[in-house]
Structures are given as structure tokens and as C-alpha cells.
A protein has these predicted regions:
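Exoplasmic/lumenal beta-rich domain surfaces
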Residues: 247, 466-528, 602-627, 727-775
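Loop and turn regions of beta-sandwich accessory domains that flank beta-strands and are enriched
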Residues: 622, 633-638, 649-815, 830
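The catalytic-center signature of Zn2+-dependent metalloproteases
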Residues: 249-275, 315-392, 468, 473-483
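Residue-level detector of functionally pivotal "anchor" positions at catalytic/ligand-binding pockets or at interdomain
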Residues: 413-418, 663-672, 806-827, 840-842, ...
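Fold-level signature of zinc-dependent metallopeptidase catalytic domains
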Residues: 22-29, 34-37, 155-309
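N-terminal prosegments of processed precursors
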Residues: 20-146, 276
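C-terminal outer-membrane/trafficking sorting elements
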Residues: 2-10, 15-19, 817-827, 831-902
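Extracellular acidic, Ser/Thr/Pro-rich low-complexity tracts
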Residues: 443, 454-459, 540, 588-594, ...
Length: 902
């Protein structure tokens, strides 16, 4: 039988530590694996890597791992990460089994821990006789997983959610939504909600169909290994977000079935359609007994569905054991099964409703646009998908629901937390000039803003944070209206993002604002008035367990009449500032100065493209729309931006284009003529007569002007167009000037409007095209021109000549201090390779001149005797067109200038 092989080329880039003391991991390189041996044949992520694991050596590393909550330091274990490194973790054993079950199956274990180098990264991993699975929740960089890659667990794949390639899978959550009687998102219940220093455990009866057991080898131990792997990830999320842990009950083996002909469950299609709800409840009631578990769940192996049976029904006899989860791809393991499906259905059982808003359910927690992206959303399953998979966390609306529900239950065992304190939110002060925290702000419409949190943790834990919308959508904000929009009057207008190490969130994403985009499909400022509410959640990621959260809220009111607040100066490419010069900054106030905290503004400067703003150009200056500033003595930069923000409010504005400091802009305009003979046009044709002009010199277009000399008795018959190198057609003359004969005209978008005359002579702006749209692209290459006479008749036309003027801009450092080089000059610049350097030397030493290209390669090196007055002409005979650095040295004096060779 011929086997189909999947070729996998994997680069070896890991640290030498792999070959040293912790060599139980081995990265695979240039490996061929039969496709039929793989759990799945599609790639997991762009950054995926394959490994083998010496399981025996790995088990030795786990020999003396302390128990979680023991108070002992964690054991050291190493795992590969998506950065190509072997990462050190401190880990504790954190069993998912009740003690009797754990004693019966000592080879099936679960662990939790924290990274030694990335203090906010937490790990969960499981091990059983077949192998391991891991989950590292890493803020700002996605979640990382290690899972079996081959069916025999001999090869593992490391992948991350940031570059995940997971395809959409069909899945339906059939849970019927119901609204719990507990408060939902009212402000009183929301304020400063924490995990209440209580660690809860619940007893989980986890049954499975026989096909699930078959997938894991056909034995009870194999099925328990699969359950343990899934619950390791599930409990990792529940503990971090809810301080809750589910333990599989001691006699769970009694509801693990190995024979599909005799198990009490329907087949996958029927069961996932809803039959399993009652079948599971009946099984748990009769086999386990209602007094012996708190929450029941069934794992299927096919069918593609989930149904919790009820919302918040844990601890309720006759209902608490009616939930199931089953995959659509026949693979009941892995991140999609564990995070997207199992935690979702268990979240329903614990009291959480759906958080998406593509449909509304009256639950009061439809707080995510579209499909949503958190656990209780429907990522990848709707027509309005934020993304294809769920992120591994609960949105706060669901955290609050579940906490509220569990506080009404008596079955969870609550243990007071004594080794970890709740993080303290000192909600942000609007500025250092005020003494009271603000929980509401009014901002201008169509203006971005920043939500800021201030948190202290008594234990010094590595904190992570989320800012999330808590505006639940109604029917008018569902379906196509569930996406973000500037005119959205209610419901969520900002998607949720996973926990971050920054307590601040830019609304919308800062990268979008830098690009001038204030509205995207999943984030948008409002152009109309409305109130928006947001929850700020702090997670403490406490090492060794007992994690705690705390939350508070803020209201942002968008004014219907004030704004937008926007910077209007520094809005064109190529603006250059000299250090020490005076510049004017302007902005549209639009009555923003009437808002609280907005009478004055701060104006800040960035020289790294807007990543940081370390320079304050004006502090606490009136918010009047105009300010003259002195440019500070910053390092030279080609990527400067401005931020203007009120002194005591949360909105801000960024200027629209990068500008320069310490550089000058050199504009070089060259006219290129068509060198061919005049040519006649064919009457009444839809076909272009095309000609080409080559521009040999590299450069970025800043302006284009086109001149045409044509003979025709009626210019209205003519069409003319241009295509830049690599571009699309742009028609700059389109049947204008009825009855006008002949032209010698230049088309310049900065020119006056077209004024028809006979002949048509002068400079005009094209009436139906904007040549400015060519700016910013490369000028080098073939420019195509098209001409046609679209009217059939006796009058024919001739293009006598045409040309294109292309202007490009280059930058060069402003002239440095020319001390020691009196009367210095370098000319011409730009030049054709020949230029003159002249100055009066202040030193008697020899004069040296070197020319380098921008890669550092030396092009020319000459030495000259010093005669006092120096004037030499230099030639760059074989140098290509481009920018070069000319260095002139006279003793201890040196100057460097840029030249442009055309």
C-alpha cells in the first residue's frame, strides 16, 4: 500500500539547553510522517513546531513536585515556547481527581505553575501513560498549547493562538437561554466585585459515550486520561477567573463506558441533537446518586453539539447532570474541544449566558459585538465572526453571573484564602491635579480615548487586566447591527481582548488611530451621542493557586454636540522641523473645552512613530486650538507624531502624518519626454493607443504633472490616461471642451480648474481625476500612457508630443555645526555624479574626503594637501543613482553631508 506522506520542514533554532541537562524535549527537523498517522493533517499555526518527549525522563522531573497549596516552593520543569526557547516553570501538582480516584490512577496527574521568566504566564499540563498536554496562558501573546501530533503520541506539536490556523468547525450550543433571577449588570452589584477570598471546589461526575473511550484506547484508564487532559485546561480557566475547581468524583469509572452496544447513550447524531440531556441525567441519578455529585457532564465523540440542559443549575437535583459536549470532527481533545466547547457548556451550567450579540436572548449579558470572542461567545460559528476560536477567558459579564449564582448555592465547598489578598483597584484619577477618582467622563464625538486602570496588589503578584464593554445589546443591535459602528446607539461597540499586562486600553486600538482609522468592524468611536459602560477586571495570577480578581466600572458619555477633537496641523507628508525652531500646532476644539477636565491640554511629542511621547511641548495650555512651540533638541527622527490630550479627561488626538525633526526635505523634479515620433489616433475606437515613458531613477512620488501637445478639431472626442509603474489606470482627460481645437496643456492637480478655450493652453487641474493619488508610490519603471479618439468622424487627431514631470522627495540630515569649515558649500545637490566641495580650512592638516553609500560601502576616498582655501570637484563615475554620504575631515574637524545622485 502506497502511503501519502506529509513533508514537514522544521528549523532547529532552540537554545543549546535542549542538549544539556533538560533534554527530555527534542525538536524534530526535516521530518516525514505518514498522513494517516496524524491526528489532523492541516497545520495548527504559523509558528508551530514539532517535538518528541522522553516521557520517562520527564516523569523523573516530576518525582518530587509539591502539592498545590502546600506552601512549598514549586518544582522546576522546562517546556519549549513559541519564541524558540526552552522556558523554566515552577510547578505544583493540582489534581483534577478526588483523592480516592487519584490513588487508584497514580499515573494520571495534573499540574499548574508559573513561568520563572514571564511572571504573568501560567501553565497547566496533564500527564498520563500515553503522554502529556499543556496550556500556557500568556498575556499579550496569546495562549500556547502542546498537544499530541500523531495518534500514537510519539510526536507533539507546539502552537499558539496568535498565529493559529484552526479552520471553522460546525458546532451548535443547544442550551435554551433563561434569565437567572439574580442581578445582572446593575452598577451597584458591579462595583468592586472580587473573588471574595474564597476558593470553591465542586464534585464533577463526568461520563462518556463508549466511542469517546475508544478514541483514548478503549479502556477506563484511557478515558480518564482524556478527561484529565481536558479538565486540566478547564480548571486552569475556572481557577484564574472564578477561584473554582472541579474534581472528578471517586467512583467516576462507573459512568465511563467501553461498549457502544451496551452504553446508555444514543448515537452521536441523535444524542447531540438533544437526547443525551435526559439520558445522562438518568444515568447519573441511577448510577452515581444525586447526593454524590454537584455537576454532571457527558463527553461524546461525534455529532458536533453541546447542550448544558439548563442555566446555573449546578447543585439542583434532577437537573445538574444533564449537560454534554461532543466534537464535530470526531476528535474529543485539543484546544478547540477543551476551550471553545467544554468550558462553554460548563459555563452555562455554572450560571453564564451567551455573551454574543449577533442574536439577543434577553439575558442582559449580550455584551460582545457579533459572535464575541470569549468563552461564552460563539467565535467561528456565526455570520458575524470576530475570530474563528474563543479566547481562553470569561468576559466579566459572565464572571459576575457565575459568581452571583454560586453565592446562592450550598453544594460548593468553600475554603477561606489566607495566602493571597484581593488586588485593590484605586480607580484612575483623571489627573494629578485632582484628588477624587472619576467613574464617568464625557468626551467629544468621533474622538478616540484611553481607559486607564490603577491597581495595587498586596502580594506583589504579576497582574493582568481587561477593559470590556458591559452594554448588553437589544434587538436593534443584533444581526447585521451587532458589528461596531459610529452611529450605534446601544449595545457593545468594542470587542473584548484577552488579559493584558497593561492596565490601559486605547479605544479603538492605538495602531488603528495612528493610521487615522477610528471605526472598524469590531471597534468604533461614536459620531452620535450615547452612554457606554465598561468593566475593568484585574487578575492577580497568584503563583501556586488561589488566584483572585477584582472589578469596577466606568461610564463614558459621548457628547452629541461637542467634537470631533482633532489635530489639524502636521497633516501632510514631508513636513520637517529644525531643532530650536518655532512651530505652530493647531487643532479643532469644536467646544471640547467646555467639557469637564478639558479647559487645558498637554501637547506631547513622539520621535518613535507614536510608541512613546517623552517630550512635552506645552503643558496645561489653554484648549484654544492654537499653540506656538519651540522644537526641543531631540535626536533626529523621520517618524515624529504629536498627541494632544486634555489635562483631566480621557480623550486624545494624534496628528495624521509622520513628520521629521533634524532633517530637511529635498524635492527633485525631473521631466521625462516621450522620445518617439508624433502619432495619429484612430477615429471612433474604444482601444487605447499606448505609449511608454521610462523613469530610471528610484524615488517616492510627491507630485506628478503631465503635459500634452495635441492637434484635433474637437478636443471633446479625446480621452487620455496614465498608469504608474505597478498601478492602475487613471484617466486625466475625458472628453472635455466641446468645440475647442488643439491643446498644449499641462495637467497639475494643484492647478486651477479647467477653462476650455481654443486652443487649450495653460496649466489646469484634471476635472475627473486626482494626480495626487499617485503620491507615495515608487516612481521608477515604465509609465504607460493611453490616448484615444472615441468619436467616429472626419476629424482625426494627432499627439504631437507629451511628457511627464515626476517630483520625488528625499531627506537629508540638517547641516551640522560647520565649525572648522568656514564658508562651507557642496553643490550642486542633487547632481549627476559630479559635485564640488568648497570651504576655508581652519586647520593646517591634510583634507580627506570619503563617499559611502547607505549600506556603508566606500565609493570614493581622496586625500588633499591643505592650501587654506579648498575647492575640489569630485566625480562618482560608476555610482548608481541614489543617496550617498560625503565625509570631509580636516584634522579633528569632520562634517558629513548627504548628496543625491540622479
Amino acid at each position: 500500500m502506497k502511503k501519502s506522506l506529509l513533508f514537514l520542514a522544521v528549523l532547529c533554532s532552540f537554545s543549546q539547553v535542549f542538549a544539556q541537562n533538560y533534554g527530555y524535549w527534542k525538536k524534530l527537523s526535516a521530518t516525514q510522517l505518514p498522513q494517516e498517522s496524524l491526528i489532523r493533517t492541516t497545520s495548527y499555526s504559523e509558528n508551530q513546531a514539532l517535538f518528541t518527549l522522553d516521557l520517562n525522563e520527564f516523569r523523573l522531573a516530576l518525582t518530587n513536585v509539591p502539592a498545590v497549596f502546600s506552601g512549598n516552593a514549586g518544582a522546576t520543569v522546562y517546556f519549549p515556547n513559541s519564541n524558540g526557547e526552552l522556558e523554566k516553570f515552577y510547578v505544583w501538582e493540582n489534581s483534577n481527581f478526588e483523592p480516592a480516584l487519584q490513588a487508584q490512577y497514580p499515573g494520571i496527574r495534573s499540574f499548574s505553575g508559573n513561568s520563572a521568566t514571564d511572571l504573568t504566564a501560567t501553565i497547566r499540563f496533564s500527564i498520563d501513560p500515553r503522554g502529556i498536554q499543556t496550556m500556557v496562558m500568556r498575556p499579550d501573546n496569546g495562549t500556547e498549547f502542546i498537544e499530541p501530533y500523531t495518534k500514537d503520541n510519539s510526536v507533539y506539536v507546539l502552537f499558539d493562538t496568535k498565529t493559529r490556523n484552526t479552520p471553522k468547525l460546525p458546532f451548535t450550543c443547544g442550551t435554551i437561554e433563561e434569565v437567572l433571577t439574580h442581578d445582572l449588570l446593575d452598577d451597584t452589584a458591579l462595583t468592586n466585585r472580587a473573588s471574595n477570598l474564597s476558593y470553591k471546589t465542586m464534585r464533577l461526575a463526568l461520563s462518556c459515550v463508549a466511542e469517546y473511550t475508544t478514541f483514548f484506547g478503549g479502556t477506563v484508564a484511557g478515558a480518564l486520561g482524556g478527561m484529565n487532559a481536558t479538565m486540566t485546561r478547564v480548571n486552569g480557566i475556572l481557577e484564574r477567573d472564578l477561584a473554582l475547581h472541579l474534581n472528578i468524583i471517586a467512583n467516576n469509572a462507573a459512568v465511563i463506558f467501553t461498549n457502544a452496544n451496551t452504553d446508555p447513550y444514543s448515537n452521536g447524531a441523535t444524542g447531540s441533537g438533544g437526547a443525551w440531556n435526559a439520558e445522562l441525567q438518568n444515568t447519573l441519578t441511577s448510577v452515581i446518586g444525586e447526593a454524590n455529585y454537584d455537576i454532571g457532564h457527558l463527553f461524546g465523540a461525534s455529532g458536533g453539539g453541546g447542550n448544558a440542559g439548563c442555566i446555573g443549575c449546578v447543585c439542583v437535583d434532577g437537573n445538574k447532570g444533564s449537560a454534554f459536549t461532543s466534537p464535530s470532527n470526531n476528535i474529543p481533545q485539543g484546544d478547540t474541544f477543551d476551550v471553545d466547547y467544554v468550558v462553554h457548556e460548563m459555563g452555562h451550567q455554572l450560571g453564564g449566558n451567551h455573551s454574543f450579540s449577533h442574536q439577543t436572548e434577553g439575558s442582559g449579558v449580550n455584551v460582545e459585538p457579533g459572535s464575541g470572542s470569549t468563552i461564552m461567545g460563539y467565535a467561528g460559528l456565526t455570520s458575524y465572526d470576530v475570530q474563528n476560536n474563543s479566547d481562553a477567558y470569561f468576559t466579566f459579564a459572565n464572571i459576575k453571573q457565575i459568581q452571583t449564582n454560586l453565592n446562592t448555592k450550598t453544594c460548593p465547598v468553600s475554603t477561606p484564602i489566607t495566602d493571597n489578598a484581593v488586588p485593590v483597584i484605586t480607580f484612575p484619577l483623571p489627573s494629578a491635579n485632582t484628588s477624587s477618582p472619576a467613574t464617568s467622563f464625557t468626551i467629544p464625538k468621533s474622538t478616540p480615548y484611553i481607559l486607564k486602570g490603577v491597581v495595587t496588589d498586596p502580594d506583589g503578584d504579576a497582574m493582568t487586566y481587561t477593559w470590556e464593554s458591559i452594554d448588553s445589546a437589544g434587538t436593534t443591535a443584533s444581526g447585521a447591527n451587532s458589528v461596531a459602528s459610529p452611529t450605534k446607539a446601544s449595545g457593545p461597540n468594542f470587542r473584548s481582548f484577552p488579559p493584558s499586562t497593561s492596565p490601559n486600553r486605547y479605544m479603538p486600538a492605538y495602531a488603528s488611530v495612528l493610521n487615522g482609522v477610528l471605526s472598524t468592524q469590531w471597534e468604533s468611536v461614536n459620531s452620535t451621542g450615547r452612554n457606554s459602560k465598561f468593566a475593568f477586571t484585574a487578575r492577580d495570577n497568584h503563583a501556586g493557586g488561589n488566584q483572585q480578581t477584582n472589578t469596577t466600572s466606568i461610564t463614558v458619555t459621548t457628547s452629541a454636540t461637542v467634537g470631533p477633537f482633532a489635530v489639524t496641523s502636521q497633516s501632510t507628508l514631508g513636513e520637517a522641523w529644525a531643532q530650536g525652531s518655532t512651530k505652530t500646532i493647531t487643532w479643532d476644539v469644536n467646544n471640547a473645552n467646555t467639557l469637564a477636565g478639558s479647559a487645558n491640554v498637554n501637547i506631547k511629542l513622539s520621535i518613535d512613530g507614536g510608541q512613546t511621547f517623552p517630550y512635552t511641548l506645552a503643558a496645561n495650555t489653554p484648549n484654544d486650538g492654537n499653540e506656538d512651540i519651540v522644537v526641543p533638541s531631540t535626536p533626529a527622527s523621520l517618524n515624529c507624531r504629536l498627541m494632544i490630550e486634555p489635562t483631566a479627561n480621557i480623550y486624545y488626538a494624534i496628528n495624521s502624518k509622520a513628520f521629521y525633526i533634524g532633517y530637511e526635505v529635498v524635492t527633485n523634479c525631473v521631466t521625462y519626454n516621450f522620445t518617439g515620433a508624433a502619432f495619429n489616433l484612430t477615429n471612433g475606437t474604444n482601444s487605447w493607443t499606448t505609449k511608454t515613458i521610462n523613469v530610471p531613477t528610484a524615488g517616492t512620488i510627491s507630485d506628478v504633472n503631465i503635459t500634452v501637445n495635441a492637434t484635433h478639431t474637437n478636443l471633446q472626442n479625446l480621452q487620455m490616461a496614465v498608469i504608474r509603474p505597478g498601478g492602475t489606470i487613471l484617466t486625466f482627460y475625458n472628453q472635455h471642451c466641446t468645440g475647442s481645437a488643439n491643446m498644449n496643456a499641462t495637467f497639475d492637480s494643484q492647478g486651477p480648474a479647467l477653462a476650455c478655450a481654443s486652443p487649450l493652453v495653460g496649466t489646469f487641474a484634471p476635472s475627473n481625476a486626482n494626480l495626487n493619488t499617485l503620491s507615495g508610490f515608487s516612481q521608477q519603471g515604465n509609465w504607460q500612457f493611453g490616448f484615444k479618439d472615441v468619436v467616429n468622424g472626419p476629424d482625426s487627431g494627432t499627439i504631437n508630443s507629451f511628457s511627464i514631470e515626476v517630483c520625488s522627495q528625499t531627506t537629508q540630515l540638517l547641516a551640522a555645526d560647520t565649525f572648522g569649515f568656514e564658508n562651507f558649500s557642496l553643490y550642486p545637490n542633487p547632481n549627476n555624479g559630479t559635485f564640488t566641495v568648497a570651504f576655508t580650512a581652519q586647520s593646517s592638516d591634510k583634507i580627506a574626503i570619503e563617499v559611502h553609500d547607505l549600506s556603508g560601502r566606500k565609493i570614493l576616498s581622496n586625500s588633499y594637501a591643505n592650501q587654506g582655501v579648498f575647492a575640489e570637484t569630485l566625480q562618482l563615475e560608476n555610482a548608481q543613482s541614489g543617496v550617498y554620504l560625503v565625509s570631509i575631515t580636516n584634522g579633528t574637524n569632520k562634517i558629513v553631508k548627504r548628496i543625491v545622485k540622479q
